[in-house]
UniProtKB/Swiss-Prot annotation:
List of glycosylated residues: 150
Protein name, as recorded: Cytochrome P450 monooxygenase lnaC
Species: Aspergillus flavus (strain ATCC 200026 / FGSC A1120 / IAM 13836 / NRRL 3357 / JCM 12722 / SRRC 167)
Cofactor entry: heme
Broad class of enzyme this protein falls into: oxidoreductase
Gene that encodes it: lnaC
Keywords associated with the record: Glycoprotein, Heme, Iron, Membrane, Metal-binding, Monooxygenase, Oxidoreductase, Transmembrane, Transmembrane helix
């Protein structure tokens, strides 16, 4: 009897061991299996001749940064050829050359899917199993319409918050003070955007703001970990585990915002009437606009206040880290530029002039800040937050033929190297040189004292994407960054830097170090 039990245990152990060995073998073979599906004629800077070399190539990308993709860009993209890359997540990707950008963004969703690629590129569908992309798209229209339409009010709110924070950080005295640049911009951007999203007094509630930052930070971390750093066979499990802090913080944020959404929607329902009549007397913030969007049919037809908090987090809270990252890059670039160019002086004088004229005319301040606008564009061109963009997945049965004649199978990831395109001498004069006023002539010509008409996206400037899936909040983001930088430079003196510090480059991330200390004082 006992012998039979031992035999049964041993048999079970052998079976479990066999299954485990098969699972591990398939896991280790997965990079090669996926890579081998691509046509043998497609070029690659990676020499993956078998399962081990494919696995090694994936692991090497952890520390390679953009080196491998840049080599592929120089070898193949500049010759109009597509090439294949292996990634940390064990899934190969076909990189298209710059000439194919328009073709890529104009393909129908049933041929090249943006939605499918986004599911894998940001892993939201894995972190939130009930993720509804249609609801996200509906609320993105609210960002496009209401945030842009209420530019004057949002500028006023942002200015009040940046003034309030700078008074606390630096004070009213004219003595030099050391400030952590990243921490300063992080606080400014979170609090200023929250002023627009939820209003006073909540945007200055330290406990609430802690939960907001935790929500955005944990969600961003989970997305990077699940989408970029986890081999795709393990993504479902790791996304759920990485999402545990997200679930905690979203519950905390919901405890503050769900009652606000519920109360605002009930009040708007009672008013009835037209959309403009509904908003009369209501706070001009994103809580109101999202609530009105649901009731007016712009947003999803059926959604709870708690769900609205989730979408607010994904659409509005998550991108906030990109704002302070960009502002830090802009200031690092300006402070380390050669003094004879007088970039800071020009921007400071423009900001003061525009602030003064705006008080008299009532026109939005951001419309006249052409030099700051150009400086932000240039820093984003030089320091692309992500080196790849325009992600698409082939969903057409039987695959698709690329413009260069290569046929790739269903399920293949496609993208372009936006970071390399934006620093290519073929598309930008002196592309490797920082020229903060590079875009000023076109901005002045296109905008005058009105909102700049120079697009934030085109085939050679892909920071915010391109085409119908470009970032819906890009104009608002630019407006906020211009206002913040303009106010700081118009009212504060900052000691220049001897050298521009290098950024942290890891996987598809390119961010400043978090410990930059600057010396700053208030100007009379």
């Amino acid at each position: 009897m006992i012998g039979e039990q031992y035999t049964s245990i041993i048999t079970g152990f052998k079976s479990a061991l066999a299954v485990s060995c098969i699972a591990v073998s398939l896991f280790l073979l997965s990079p090669w299996i996926a890579y081998a599906r691509l046509p043998s004629s497609i070029k690659s800077p990676i020499k993956a001749k078998g399962p081990l070399s494919a696995l090694r190539a994936c692991l090497n990308e952890i520390s390679a940064g953009a080196k491998t993709s840049t080599r592929g860009y120089e070898l193949y993209s500049k010759k109009g050829q597509s090439f294949a890359m292996l990634n940390i997540n064990f899934r190969p990707q076909v990189i298209l050359p710059p000439e194919h950008v328009r073709w890529l963004v104009t393909q129908p969703e049933d041929i090249l899917s943006h939605a499918k690629a986004s599911d894998d590129a940001d892993a939201l569908g894995y972190i939130w199993p009930l993720f509804d992309a249609s609801a996200l798209h509906s609320f993105s229209k609210v960002l496009q319409i209401d945030l842009t339409r209420n530019v004057t009010q949002t500028e006023k709110d942002v200015l009040e918050e940046v003034q309030h924070i700078m008074d606390e950080l630096v004070g009213q005295t004219e003595s030099w003070k050391e400030v952590n640049m990243v921490q300063a911009f992080e606080r400014i951007m979170y609090q200023a955007t929250q002023r627009v999203y939820v209003g006073l007094p909540l945007c200055r509630d330290s406990t609430y703001m802690g939960y907001v930052k935790g929500y955005a930070r944990s969600l961003g971390t989970a997305m990077v970990f699940a989408a970029q750093l986890t081999p795709w066979p393990l993504r479902q499990v790791t996304a759920l585990l990485a999402g545990l802090p997200v679930y905690y913080y979203v519950l905390r944020v919901r405890s503050y915002l769900s009652p606000l959404f519920k109360e605002r929607m009930e009040r708007l329902k009672e008013k009835g009437g037209t959309q403009d009549d509904n908003l009369e007397g209501e706070p001009r913030n994103l809580i109101t606009w999202m609530s009105d969007g649901v009731l007016s049919g712009v947003g999803p037809k059926s959604i709870s206040p708690s769900e609205m908090v989730t979408w607010l987090g994904i659409l509005a809270l998550l991108p906030t880290d990109n704002l302070w990252t960009t502002c830090t890059n802009v200031l690092l670039d300006l402070l380390s530029s050669e003094s004879e160019h007088a970039y800071l002086h020009t921007i400071r004088e423009e900001a003061r002039t525009v602030f003064a004229s705006s008080k008299e005319s009532g026109k939005p301040v951001s419309h006249g800040l052409h030099h700051i606008d150009s400086a932000i564009r240039e820093s984003l061109r030089m320091n692309s937050l992500s080196p790849r963009s325009l992600h698409r997945q082939v969903v057409r049965r039987g695959g698709v033929v690329l413009p260069d004649g290569q046929k790739v199978p269903t399920g293949t990831w496609l993208c372009v190297l936006s970071g390399n395109i934006q620093r290519d001498e073929d598309y930008y004069e002196d592309a490797q040189t920082y020229k903060p006023f590079r875009f000023v002539p076109k901005l002045t010509e296109a905008g005058g004292d009105k909102a700049p008409l120079l697009p934030l996206t085109n085939e050679k400037y892909l920071t915010f994407g391109y085409g119908r899936h470009a970032c819906p909040g890009r104009w608002f983001s630019f407006q906020v960054m211009k206002i913040v930088i303009a106010y700081i430079l118009a009212n504060y003196d900052i000691q220049p830097l001897e050298k521009r510090p290098d950024n942290i480059v890891f996987a598809d991330l390119n961010i400043p170090h978090l410990s930059h200390i600057i010396r700053i004082k208030r100007m009379t």
